[in-house]
Amino acid sequence: MSTTKTTKMTVKTGSKGTSGRVVRVTGPVVDVEFPHGFVPELFNALNAKTTFSSLAKTLTLEVAQHLGDNLVRTISLQPTDGLVRGVEVTDTGNSISVPVGEGVKGHVFNALGYCLDEPGYGDEFEHWSIHRKPPSFEELEPRTEMLETGLKVVDLLTPYVRGGKIALFGGAGVGKTVLIQEMINRIARNFGGTSVFAGVGERTREGNDLWVELQEVNVLKDTALVFGQMDEPPGTRMRVALSALTMAEWFRDEASQDVLLFIDNIFRFTQAGSEVSTLLGRMPSAVGYQPTLADEMGELQERITSTRGRSITSMQAVYVPADDYTDPAPATTFAHLDATTELSRSVFAKGIFPAVDPLASSSTILDPGIVGEEHYRVAQEVIRILQRYKDLQDIIAILGIDELSEEDKQLVNRARRIERFLSQNMMAAEQFTGQPGSTVPVKETIDAFDRLCKGEFDHVPEQAFFLIGGLDDLTKKAESLGAKL
């Protein structure tokens, strides 16, 4: 019996400085041929020098696929205008890296780590790769702790987890970005923490407004900003969240700080991944999204976590396409969240800000074992009253409020006061309302809503509860309307 001897062919992966040449350009997708046996590894950054409109520029390409025959398919992180076949491409030998350290605070960077407000700044800093492994199971923090925000509706009904992942869901124009700006202000002013903001595929104007506003309220010095706005190629929009997360990881792991990571908007991360997937020729999955949607989302979300004594708390704005929560993009995000704050168009239409829907929002730590028995009891009573009010809406619309029982009439009046008391004057809206933002301690919030649910404020006019802070504000406004608490 004869035996056939098989031999393995070893392929030497690319090393730093190896040069190839462009053989195909299709929008942001660039195919590059390398010498035999010197193929760059996946996620390696390649540099291509080109000229467009008499200006020389260097493009950064990221290896996405090995096609065989010494060809790699890459995604460009800059516009490929002027790039032609035959252009020399150099393998850097490393993946994309960004500057880290205390020096990144107070500055704006792009996905590649280049400083936008001060060109050349940060080049000498230590750089970390944006592709990193999440902390091991042994490093994770087992303790669960509440993050106090000073916003009544959040602290009472959807308490945030320190080191958790929090999402702001909502359609277009209901206040997701404003609420994120509010949280940056509150964390910097009240807690002195470090914030990292990732602008993923949103409007350039919003980024500029945020930059100016953070300067005005003197919190820019504690915030690092990383932008990849909606006019950028999909490769940039897909990587900018990882760049910001890498900066946040340095503050957690090396500086032992609690960090807040803001991502606006996580849907654009998914959208960019879908565009890249299509460009790479992958078969689309449900509703046209990429087949690797859950994997890509998991790679990002698993790195956002608490290690022992240190945390990254993430707030992510999630655009909901056509207000459809069954869309795969928001649905995939749900699986990773500790708290959800849903911003509702119907609440927004009532002029209640922040426009949080208290019945649709939720938190995994609204549990008596974590927030305490009293907090849990008051929150459940508020939810019960608001749910009953919602159930009565059809009867009120058809027959009128006079047809309700005396008990239900009392409950409706109480629910309307609760709805208005859940609104609050915000720091981010001071220039529009002329009112300074207010911060309400959790204990005061619980006490105020407990008394409200028991009917102690039934005699106070509804408008006294609108856009105010705590009990002191309520007392002043009630007295101005001729009522006493």
Curated annotation (Swiss-Prot):
Mode of membrane association: Peripheral membrane protein
Lipid metabolism keyword on record: no
Disordered as annotated region, ranges: 1-20
Any single Gene Ontology cellular-component annotation: proton-transporting ATP synthase complex
EC number: 7.1.2.2
Broad class of where this protein is predominantly found: membrane
Pfam family, one: ATP-synt_ab_N
Enzyme class per UniProt: translocase
Keyword annotations from UniProtKB, A to Z: ATP synthesis, ATP-binding, Cell membrane, CF(1), Hydrogen ion transport, Ion transport, Membrane, Nucleotide-binding, Translocase, Transport
Annotated GO MF terms: ATP binding; ATP hydrolysis activity; proton-transporting ATP synthase activity, rotational mechanism
Residues where ATP binds: 170-177
Subcellular location field: Cell membrane
InterPro entries registered for this protein in UniProt: AAA+_ATPase, ATP-synt_VA_C, ATP_synth_F1_bsu, ATPase_a/bsu_AS, ATPase_alpha/beta_chains, ATPase_F1/V1/A1_a/bsu_N, ATPase_F1/V1/A1_a/bsu_N_sf, ATPase_F1/V1/A1_a/bsu_nucl-bd
NCBIfam families, per database record: atpD (TIGR01039)
Subunit structure: F-type ATPases have 2 components, CF(1) - the catalytic core - and CF(0) - the membrane proton channel. CF(1) has five subunits: alpha(3), beta(3), gamma(1), delta(1), epsilon(1). CF(0) has three main subunits: a(1), b(2) and c(9-12). The alpha and beta chains form an alternating ring which encloses part of the gamma chain. CF(1) is attached to CF(0) by a central stalk formed by the gamma and epsilon chains, while a peripheral stalk is formed by the delta and b chains.
Membership in a protein family: Belongs to the ATPase alpha/beta chains family.
Function statement: Produces ATP from ADP in the presence of a proton gradient across the membrane. The catalytic sites are hosted primarily by the beta subunits.
Name of this chain's protein: ATP synthase subunit beta
Source organism (scientific name): Mycobacterium leprae (strain TN)
